[in-house]
Structures are given as C-alpha cells and as structure tokens.
Amino acid sequence: MSEIKKIATRDSYGNTLVELGKEHDNLVVLDAYLAGATKTGVFKKEFPERHIDCGIAEGNMAGIAAGLATCGKVPFMSSFAMFAAGRAFEQVRNSIGYPHLNVKIGATHAGISVGE
C-alpha cells in the first residue's frame, strides 16, 4: 500500500490546474489578485498567456469568464469563497448559470483555516 502524502488544498488546486493545462489547451485561469493565496500563480508561471489577473473585481471576473466560455475556452475562476459567492453572485447567476456556460469556480479559504 502506498503512503498517503498530505498536501494543502490550495497547493493541490494550483498543481492540478497545471496538470489540466498540459492536457487542455483551451483551459484559462482567472484570479482576483490572489495568485499567491489561491496558488493559481503556479499555473501562471507555467502558462502566462492563459492566466488573467482580474484584480479585486470578482463580478467582472465572472463576466470575463462567461465571455471566454462562449468562445470555446474553459475558464477557472479563482477567489476567496466569500467573494466568489458574495461579490459575484448576480454575474455568476445571470452570465454563467442561466446560459449554462462551462465555467469552473474555485473558491478557497472558506473556513477558519487556509487549508494547510
């Protein structure tokens, strides 16, 4: 039986985005000025042309992700859970949910720890 290695959830998220990026040329990662905290910076280092820093503007990030999805990209939005759910709710519902667009939302830091 192999040994199980513990890894922080956010580290796993960043590493998995890189693995998926190697397999899928249409994968794009967006973050809200949180590349270090959400570990999307790992993806940015590997694929700088497929990473978009949207600044502290989760609602706008949802709109950008929706636009990219309509053009055949598979966007991964990344932010703190509080802001991904709270600040971007209407844009996610109206621009992504209603038209059933293929957008993924990675919401980190949802609890009382950072997932170390």
Where are the model-predicted features located?
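Thiamine diphosphate
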Residues: 1-116
